[in-house]
Amino acid sequence: MTRIVSTAVGRRPPALSGDRKVEILGVAGAGKSTLAALLGRGTGVEKAAFIHARQPSHLAQMVRSTPRLLPVLVGGLTRTPRMTWPEFKLLVYVTRWRLFLRRSMPPRGVVLLFDQGPVYALVRLKAEGKPFTTRRAFERWSEEMLGGWAGELTGLIFLDAPDSVLWSRINERPQGHKQKGEEATTGLDFIARYRRSFEDVLRRVEELGGPRVLRFDTGTATAVQIAEKVKPLLKDRRG
């Protein structure tokens, strides 16, 4: 199980001078959005936009992503179960958002904070295990995208908790979740599958020389406690 740590694993420090991009990620019920909301209230932090198909500028990114995604789309649309619209949006998000965000970066010194950002999107695609994710075209795309984002992000915050805590939160929180109300064995299998995918992707990020990963156990630490530990890295620290 993860725990609060003062140090982090990885090759690069979690905050660098100049543009800084930090992603919060973790298994369902770990408290990602709660922590993101706390950090987002502070000065010097701006939450990164996610993809919304109703915005014309985002629709343009979908069109521009098609040539690069075509080999992946062929596999996703010709084999059942087929790729869903949300999965397509995740593919576009991971493919185009580095370029998209560079056009509207916050002022120097302001941290761009991702709540379920590009690394999470890659994990979700892999964890869902659709047939198109087993094809060579997806593997090549995934490796290329992960390498790009590993060089773009300056910090990763990974939240986890014991299985029983995560499962209880999924069922008790007001917002919906596809595992909510399912048998416990089904829910615990879901948690384990996603955790394995997170660990696989984070291990690859480290191998690619990506940012350090700060790990916290939200079963023993509150979001406020974690935020207090993270805030100094988002403000004044330099790599």
What are these regions (language model features)?
Residues 3-15:
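Pre-Walker A adenine-sensing motif
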Residues 24:
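Hydrophobic anchor at the beta1->P-loop junction of P-loop NTPases
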Residues 29:
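Walker A (P-loop) phosphate-binding loop of P-loop NTPases
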Residues 32:
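Conserved lysine of the Walker
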Residues 35, 39:
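Hydrophobic positions on the alpha1 helix immediately C-terminal to the Walker A/P-loop
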Residues 54-136:
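ATP-dependent small-molecule kinase phosphotransfer cores
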Residues 114-117, 149-172:
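Conserved phosphate-donor/acceptor-positioning beta-strand/loop module used by diverse small-molecule
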Residues 168-239:
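NTP-dependent small-molecule kinase module
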